[in-house]
Swiss-Prot record:
GO terms for cellular component: cytoplasm; DNA-directed RNA polymerase complex. PROSITE patterns: 4FE4S_FER_1 (PS00198), 4FE4S_FER_2 (PS51379), RNA_POL_D_30KD (PS00446). The lineage of its organism: Archaea, Methanobacteriati, Methanobacteriota, Archaeoglobi, Archaeoglobales. GO terms for molecular function: 3 iron, 4 sulfur cluster binding; DNA binding; DNA-directed RNA polymerase activity; metal ion binding; oxidoreductase activity; protein dimerization activity. Keywords: 3Fe-4S, Cytoplasm, DNA-directed RNA polymerase, Iron, Iron-sulfur, Metal-binding, Nucleotidyltransferase, Transcription, Transferase. Its EC number is 2.7.7.6. It is found in: Cytoplasm. It holds the Pfam family RNA_pol_A_bac. CDD domains: RNAP_D (cd07030). This is DNA-directed RNA polymerase subunit Rpo3. The keyword Cytoplasm applies. The keyword Lipoprotein does not apply.
């Protein structure tokens, strides 16, 4: 059977889905591709011309690097693939400028971008506070990169999965309820004089229910279905991250097939 994806829940920055008919290797490859292979924009270096705040230049640069930037993959090249040879041009990088005086809290929305569409994804993130008489003037240059290079380029902040198990309660069950009390995830409930599974998605496969069941009525088995939870940073829509990750995996698989054919 071919792997399938079933969307369970989708919000602005979060998505839950089931990856069906997949091996653990495929599930983990998909997770790693979303975190480490899909490109996103991030501040790469900062030129600070004036800083009389209480913060060191390095601290400000680090904070800017971790701010998610709205990313348009069709409008920018990776610097390693750009015609400028990686020196930096409008096709592979963009600048954000700031010139402010205190007293003021500097927010991510205060920065002026070369492109009005390419801005920090969330405009109310506080960067630092300037007090009376303090100034900050800088230029931050952003480019595309991947999480393999640095965490600041990851388009997702959370990308995890768990196996969806198969839980079987057989005819040996006497309805004692020990498994209900032992289960830390509230997976079981009483059903007359028996026990039934009410929330298999919550199961962490800890095995507590199997341990306490003296009747050997419960079995918990692995399946080929995985529950994914993915939260984006705002740099890219989560669906686009998923789609791009699948494209990358397909490209890698095709490249591997070519290598194998050449060897044969």
């Amino acid at each position: 059977m071919m792997p399938e994806i079933e969307i369970l829940e989708e919000k602005d920055f979060k998505i839950k889905f089931i990856l069906k008919n997949a091996s653990p290797a495929l599930a983990n490859s998909f997770r790693r591709a979303m975190k480490a292979e899909v490109p996103a924009m991030a501040v790469d270096y900062v030129d600070i011309y004036l800083n009389s705040s209480y913060f060191y230049d390095e601290v400000i640069a680090h904070r800017l690097a971790m701010l998610p930037i709205k990313t348009y993959l069709d409008r920018f090249n990776m610097q390693s693939e750009c015609s400028c040879g990686g020196e930096g041009c409008p096709n592979c990088q963009i600048s954000f400028r700031l010139n402010v005086e205190g007293p003021k809290v500097v927010y991510s929305g205060d920065f002026i971008s070369d492109d009005p569409d390419v801005v920090f994804a969330i405009d109310n993130i506080p960067v630092l506070e300037l007090f009376e008489g303090q100034q900050l003037m800088l230029e931050a240059v952003a480019r595309l990169g991947t999480g393999r290079e640095h965490a600041k380029f990851q388009p997702v902040s959370v990308c995890v999965y768990k196996i969806i198990p198969e839980i079987v309660v057989n005819e040996n069950c006497n309805g004692c309820g020990d498994c209900i009390e032992a289960c830390p995830r509230n997976v079981f409930e009483k059903d007359g004089d028996k026990v039934r599974v009410k929330n298999v998605m919550a199961c962490s496969m800890c095995g507590e229910c199997v341990e306490v069941c003296e009747m050997n009525a419960i079995s918990v088995n692995e399946t080929n279905n995985f529950l994914f939870t993915v939260e984006g940073t705002g740099a890219l829509p989560v669906r686009e991250v998923m789609k791009k990750a699948l494209e990358i995996l397909r490209s890698k698989a095709e490249e591997m097939n070519k290598i194998i054919e050449e060897i044969q």
